Amino acid sequence: MTYDTTLPYPRDLIGHGRHPPHARWPGGARIAVQFVLNYEEGGENCVLHGDAGSEQFLSEMFNPASYPERHMSMEGIYEYGARAGVWRILREFEQRGLPLTVFGVATALQRHPEVCAAFTELGHEIACHGLKWIHYQNVPEDVERAHLQEAMAIIERLTGTRALGWYTGRDSPRTRRLVADFGGFAYDSDYYGDDLPFWMQVRRTDGSVVPQLIVPYTLDCNDMRF
C-alpha cells in the first residue's frame, strides 16, 4: 500500500482495506514492537524558554491554564521526569536487555547532557522529536523549518550521529513536507492511522515527489492517557 498525499484529496481513508497483508517480520516473528520513550522535559512551553506562557497540553494537572509567567507546579511536574522518572525507566530496560527508541526533543536533551549520554551509552536509538515541545500548527513555515534544522544539528552534536527517525507529535500541515525537504530519514512516525508501516508519497517544496517510510505511532498505547 502507498499513501499518496499528492492527490487532489490528500487523505487515504481506505488503507489496506478488507485484506491487510502479512507483515512477514524477520525470524518468523508474529509482531514487531518499538518501545518509545518521549523525552520532552525541558523542551515544553515555559517563559524561561522564550515562550509566551506555561505548558498546558500534557501534565498530571487537570485542564491547566497557560500563564504568561512561570508556573511552578507545571515546571515541577516536568522536572520529575528528568530528575527521577527517566532513570527508573532506563534501569528497567537495562535489566531486561530491551532496546528503546527515544523520541528526544532537542532542547530537552541539550539541557540534560547526562541523560543524553546515557541513552547513547546504553545503545538506545535517539529519534528527533523537534526542537521544542510546542504546537507547530500556527508557527510560520520558515520558523518551523529553522527549528527542524537546528534540532537535527543539536542531536548530531550531542550524540555524534544524525537522527534517522522523526516524530513531532504537535505537528502542522507543513511538517511532513519540511521533513521530506530535509531528507535522509529512515522513517517518520507522525501518523496514527494504521497498525503496519507503509510508504507515503510526499511532495517536497520544490515540487519533486519522494517516498517516505511511515512507522505509525500507536497513540492509544501512550501512557499519557492513563
Where are the regions a protein language model picked out?
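A conserved mid-domain beta-alpha-beta active-site/ligand-binding segment of alpha/beta enzyme cores
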Residues: 211-226
